[in-house]
């Protein structure tokens, strides 16, 4: 049966306050490269950027990581798969305060034995008194405890290790503990390549290492989002792949198969019931994965929910994903044929709005019919003129170069260099209005 949803107006009306499922959000474990006993737990949507902040390369480090005698820090493990930043913060707090968390079962042998520590280098037990809060073994034991809890065990969590010795401690602890992790929780390793020298290792650490290769955007589902838009905006009649009833695009919440060759679409409630029925589990209310009713391929529920949230309340994120940005100051008429940008802004919100270049722009005019001539000028944001020999701009890599190709007319070209220079001196904007160039004058 189709869902009894009357309208999606409430979802669309709440787009300003409800954001889509974030592309990436994780909790991380830091370890000081100088003193391995110094550890730090935090959460972030961008691990590489956050690691640079902790190491002092960018502004915004935590108070506990400001000490220069403990820098640099390395990110040894992350826990990802959270559907919101609130969920990541919730797991972060539980990981930092496992003893007082209601999700941790402290009965029996759930916690680490006092006075027992596992050496990361030799993977052997060291029976000496250690601080439980700063012990790597204790932190990994608390992580294992939370992942086995009834609350977090049903989340689509992935644990990724970047350090081999930390992963060795994790494996030793798995052999000691009685409980097992849920099959839905993935544990992967992402170590640095073998054969790296000490100098190369320091450079790799300064550049965030393997952490910098993580996909923290929606690029992994870009083709999926494009396919769903094309399928649902086609206007043809689409029937639910489960209940076979017609889908009402304006009223139903529709889930689309993530495989590129399949055109299956279904009601969200129908597909959820189909997934739970195949798993034959009465304890779960939200599925984690399932098979498509048409192509019988494996589908991840979190991936489908990301696409639905982007489609219903993430139009701004979709526009940034496909580069649909209107260039400020671009004339509607013909003339401006090529716009070339160089470099990228380091601002975190650079994709939220089109930034005005803070450098110099180089403008090149094509030759007039009377003879070859070129005016090279650099127009700054404040309207100043800086002539460069040969038309070479002295701006840095973040400068944007705008090169308009303008068709000139002989009857409108006047040979007066002084007048032309004065006209350029009155320019107050970095953007070029084509109507100002119709009266261009030839400089001989």
Curated annotation (Swiss-Prot):
A Pfam family per the record: GIY-YIG
Disulfide bond sites: none
Localization in the cell: Nucleus
EC number: 3.1.-.-
Molecular function in Gene Ontology: 5'-flap endonuclease activity; crossover junction DNA endonuclease activity; zinc ion binding
Claim: Metal-binding is one of the keywords in the record: yes
Keyword check for S-adenosyl-L-methionine: no
GIY-YIG domain residues: 23-105
Cofactor(s) essential for the protein: a divalent metal cation
CDD domains for the chain: GIY-YIG_SLX1
One cellular-component annotation, GO: Slx1-Slx4 complex
Keywords: DNA damage, DNA recombination, DNA repair, Endonuclease, Hydrolase, Metal-binding, Nuclease, Nucleus, Zinc, Zinc-finger
Subunit-structure text: Forms a heterodimer with SLX4.
HAMAP family named among the record's database cross-references: Endonuc_su_Slx1
Function (record text): Catalytic subunit of the SLX1-SLX4 structure-specific endonuclease that resolves DNA secondary structures generated during DNA repair and recombination. Has endonuclease activity towards branched DNA substrates, introducing single-strand cuts in duplex DNA close to junctions with ss-DNA.
PANTHER family reported in the protein's UniProt record: STRUCTURE-SPECIFIC ENDONUCLEASE SUBUNIT SLX1 (PTHR20208:SF10)
Protein name, UniProt field: Structure-specific endonuclease subunit SLX1
Organism: Paracoccidioides lutzii (strain ATCC MYA-826 / Pb01) (Paracoccidioides brasiliensis)
